[in-house]
């Protein structure tokens, strides 16, 4: 089970990578968008890992036997929770007047950042 310090560290790294991906690939430069991405990419993994801690769900931490992409259900959950959190926050917040594909791309890039950090960095 991950300690709270590790969860916070991983979520902070997720937020940083999500902001970089959204700024570089998604070409979003608005401070409001980038702050929202950081908040969502931090909050999603924290929420998911809090659920895993509260339920002592250790079986979610088994990595797939794929050396180049050893993803686990825990990693996947962090990405999915970040994606969902970002879709809601961005869609109701700073990107509410943008086309849905821009909201979806920004949320997807943020979720991807959370997934990659989870798989490779903690």
What residue spans do the PLM features occupy?
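Juxtamembrane/disordered regions of integral membrane proteins
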Residues: 1-35, 39, 46-122
